[in-house]
């Protein structure tokens, strides 16, 4: 069995986690107390959903997930919420005092005390797996817990489970909308360790998802629940191939192989289509070619960056629902003819497609329409460097005056870490620049070589 363990860190991670598990339960017909009426084989672990749920002797299904936060409010909501019977109480870990938007608190002082407990719980989950394939880590890098404790945990996971792949769903700070003044510090420090310790990181940002819900779902003032449910659909689409059967199934490590040309260049853009309200869906066809074109629209990106400013290096299209390979091939052929979608010249094919026959599920009373087919795209594009450039610029403005730095130093960090992390990101921007640069200027010398 190819199990995956989900780790939800900090407020963002836990709240996105809530939306995801709500959706996973609906998709598999698992009730909030973990019972699954449709599952006839009690205790048999070969069903596809066992990648995400472990089954107890009593026939109860328990998510392979850990929720951790340094302050209790968010985790307490899960402990008292609708799904309180679903999770094992030991999987919900919370501390007493929060990281106060401070990376150093999450990483050094307060995170240090809780991280061993977390690893212990993760170890128990891992021991329950017959063939663990990797971890899905959900966190935000703007706050203190998601960035600090998230980075610490990833570092420790690299030590304990070196070969297992780690996929991150990471909420990055938005260009205009901000929840904390020190976001640029936290994100730069956290990205510094994400570069080393994650294999693929899907970048999300609230502002882009706000705009998406406002434009397509006619919600005037989207709440975090609206946003998280949309993120839930994306996560579900990416992991559908682990949990259901389909024509072209995709493994966790397969994402890595197809999306990451160089180890450091592993930050990917995600889009999902169709994001459409029930009123509109009534009048639309939403054919395979339509939704395939929609995921390449700059407006449907889940991160505020314009893919037309960069080049694609690789691209995965995960279809689900009523889709046949013939339609997919036709849609991809059409996309390739478009001039707006440019690939780097060293990546000629560039597309990986997955098809899964399970149609997308919607949360009852949610905003999304029930549709026959959907597609989720994950793309590695050089345009993502815009996101880093933006954060780095804000970091520089604050750091040039050493504003707020004493809060970090007071928690046991050294100023050198700031400049080290910043240099690492400068190198990353440079890497993206080089990858996207035309390799035409090299061709002159290479013609001489005989093969």
Swiss-Prot record:
Residues that span the membrane, as ranges: none
GO cellular component: cytoplasm; microtubule
Enzyme superclass (EC): hydrolase
Residues reported in the UniProt entry to bind GTP: 11, 71, 144-145, 179, 206, 228
Reactions catalysed, as given in the entry: GTP + H2O = GDP + phosphate + H(+)
SS bond list: none
Keyword list, A-Z: Acetylation, Cytoplasm, Cytoskeleton, GTP-binding, Hydrolase, Magnesium, Metal-binding, Microtubule, Nucleotide-binding
Lineage: Eukaryota, Discoba, Euglenozoa, Kinetoplastea, Metakinetoplastina
The family this protein is said to belong to: Belongs to the tubulin family.
Protein name: Tubulin alpha chain
GO molecular function, one term: metal ion binding
Cofactor: Mg(2+)
Complex formation: Dimer of alpha and beta chains. A typical microtubule is a hollow water-filled tube with an outer diameter of 25 nm and an inner diameter of 15 nM. Alpha-beta heterodimers associate head-to-tail to form protofilaments running lengthwise along the microtubule wall with the beta-tubulin subunit facing the microtubule plus end conferring a structural polarity. Microtubules usually have 13 protofilaments but different protofilament numbers can be found in some organisms and specialized cells.
Binding site for Mg(2+): 71
Active-site positions on this chain: 254
Pfam families noted in UniProt: Tubulin (PF00091), Tubulin_C (PF03953)
Post-translation changes: Undergoes a tyrosination/detyrosination cycle, the cyclic removal and re-addition of a C-terminal tyrosine residue by the enzymes tubulin tyrosine carboxypeptidase (TTCP) and tubulin tyrosine ligase (TTL), respectively. Acetylation of alpha chains at Lys-40 stabilizes microtubules and affects affinity and processivity of microtubule motors. This modification has a role in multiple cellular functions, ranging from cell motility, cell cycle progression or cell differentiation to intracellular trafficking and signaling.
Enzyme nomenclature, EC number: 3.6.5.-
Residues the UniProt record annotates as site (Involved in polymerization): 451
Record's subcellular location: Cytoplasm, Cytoskeleton
N6-acetyllysine modification, residue list: 40
Protein purpose: Tubulin is the major constituent of microtubules, a cylinder consisting of laterally associated linear protofilaments composed of alpha- and beta-tubulin heterodimers. Microtubules grow by the addition of GTP-tubulin dimers to the microtubule end, where a stabilizing cap forms. Below the cap, tubulin dimers are in GDP-bound state, owing to GTPase activity of alpha-tubulin.
